[in-house]
């Protein structure tokens, strides 16, 4: 169980099962859900304290379109007053924006875990580039499964973990307090 933390959920389609699961696991986590495609979000009362933002996080901000988009840096500055935050979990299902947004967001706000649905809207070279980015920035895949909705192989769910975070958890949980340093806390 987590005592507290910061969680980002990008793309909700007005469904909050992910946020419910996080709330059961971490009652004091601050959860921010972003979705500019939902006009009137129906946030369940059990998720009080969840912050819903009616905008999309995009590689470039939008000015005149119907859907408001903000860059990762604008988002972090507006929500937290600073772009210097660390996320416990980043969940992304943004129908193709992951190729541009995920690298920019992780460079500004590293996350201990990343759950992302990767869509086949780009080439395999783009997918390979995104996976290389994740590895070069210290993330390993710990789970992967095909999303069975829609066209075959059109989306794959990936779960990444920060190598540094996994190491800290391993030392703390499996080796005990005797091997835990202040940096592990």
Can you annotate each of these PLM segments?
Residues 1-185:
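Phosphate/nucleotide-binding beta-alpha loop and adjacent structural elements of enzyme active sites
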């Amino acid at each position: 169980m987590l005592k507290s933390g910061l969680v980002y959920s990008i793309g909700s389609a007005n469904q909050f099962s992910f946020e419910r699961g996080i709330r059961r696991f971490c009652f004091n986590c601050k959860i921010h859900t972003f979705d500019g495609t939902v006009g009137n979000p129906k946030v369940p009362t059990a998720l009080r304290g969840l912050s819903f933002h009616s905008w999309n996080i995009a590689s470039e901000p939008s000015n005149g379109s119907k859907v408001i988009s903000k860059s990762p840096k604008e988002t972090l500055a507006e929500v937290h007053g600073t772009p210097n935050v660390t996320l416990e979990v980043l969940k992304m299902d943004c129908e193709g924006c992951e190729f541009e947004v995920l690298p920019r967001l992780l460079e500004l706000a590293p996350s201990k875990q990343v759950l992302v649905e990767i869509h086949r809207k780009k080439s395999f070279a783009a997918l390979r580039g995104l996976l290389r980015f994740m590895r070069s920035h210290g993330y390993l895949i710990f789970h992967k499964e095909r999303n069975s909705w829609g066209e075959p192989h059109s989306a794959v769910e990936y779960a990444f973990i920060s190598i540094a975070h996994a190491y800290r958890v391993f030392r703390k949980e499996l080796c005990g307090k005797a091997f835990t340093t202040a940096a592990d806390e």
